Amino acid sequence: MGWHDTSEPLTTKAIEDGHWTFVSQQIKTVAKKPVAQGYRNTDPRVMEQNLQDGKMDVVAGLRYSIADPALPRKVMEDRTCDMRLCIVCCRCLDDVVSQGKPLNYCGVNPRLGEELDHEAFPQASKRKKVMVVGSGPAGINAALTAAQRGHAVDLYEEGPRLGGCVKMSSIFSPYHERYLDYLLTQVKQHPQITVHLKTKVTPETVRQAKPDAAIVAVGGKPLGLDVPGADGKNVVSSHDFLEMINGHKPAGKRGAFNSFMWGAGSLFLSMYYTPSFARTMTEKSPWPISRNVAIIGGGLPGCEFGHLCMETGRTTAIIEERKKVGFDVGGSDRFGLISSFKQAENVEMYPLTRVTAITEEGVRAVQTTPEGDMELFIPAKTVAITLGLAENHDLGEACKPLVDEVYLVGDCETPGRIADATKMGYRAACAL
């Protein structure tokens, strides 16, 4: 069957749930003992159907139980909304197999690796009024953990709905969408959490709220590009899309038509957004992503966006200053992702390439080759900047003179992945 570095990867999200049951089904035709099947099982509905269809006798697996050790009990009790399902981020595999690290991080289970250190939700010795600012995975996990420990939690979100960056990553991954649904359900069910939507938190907001503790999870600052044309009307960024999903028209959008469309799109999505709808619109609409795209930034965000562009038939160029496109993609996913780019007729990768200017016709750049630097012009109707995030300590520092306990978590403290944010939110709430 191979491993991650084969033409068909074994356990990544590129493989559908239950895909490998055809192997166990064939083994059952000759086996005299019960057959267990253990790869790519994350959805209990698929597992149950495969058992009923006789494709296996026993569901084996690890990642679904890493994500939620109580999953079998929840299945028996039909607690569908409380199932914390694996998002197939492969962080567990990357840490243990690729890097030889302990099994301490999971994209959705903040307690992983700390089971013997303390109770899951140690009861607080003193009930506190806790202000959580930001509702991404760090903020929501902090809010849920603090509430479980007995604190009174106020969860603030500047946009019209909870979810933070997961609202956008859900467009690329249905697995993230179901995790977002889980988080929203848990917040809604908890009586100790009061949600404040469409509320921008400032130092004055904190002063008036008078919390005993503040957990700041407002996300990082998007990294920009300082070259001529970076503010052109054909330029978009991942932050622009997050702003639009939050119902805010991104700043600096030039051109009457362009400005109108961003404003109208922001207004519409503030009322009717769902990840599935946004995914469909991204696939079919020529705006704001045209059929010819240059992506500046070949890290994980750029690669995921590039994969979406590739699958939707867009001519796609991925430009990266480092030696390799996908330099920070996990070991489990990297080979299959880069192989799909190499095999696609509509994708070109430009490593060791520095952008010098952006025009309405495309991107000017300089690529380092063994023969020396070579000037390039990469045609594109849309230029997407996906350079990642920088830390964002402004609000956290402003809160310190106002609140006895202040914790910065998630990308605003240290930009990272969903597993890092999940763990940081949990640990901060346990420290209250």
Regions found by a protein language model. Name each.
Residues P69, V96, L116, L223-L225, ...:
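Glycine/Thr-rich phosphate-binding loops of Rossmann-like dinucleotide-binding domains
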Residues E177-G224, G232, D240, A256-S259, ...:
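A Rossmann-like FAD-binding core segment of flavoenzymes
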Residues K126-G136, P286-G299:
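Beta1/beta-strand and adjacent pyrophosphate-binding region of the FAD-binding site
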Residues D68, R73-K74, G306-R314, I318-I319, ...:
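Internal hydrophobic alpha-helix adjacent to the cofactor/substrate pocket in enzyme cavities
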Residues H151-G164, R314-G326:
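Glycine-rich FAD pyrophosphate-binding loop
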Residues P301-L308, V329-G330, K400, V409-L432:
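A conserved FAD-binding loop/helix module that cradles the flavin
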Residues P34, K129, A152-D154, N292, ...:
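Residues at the starts of beta-strands that form the adenosine-phosphate
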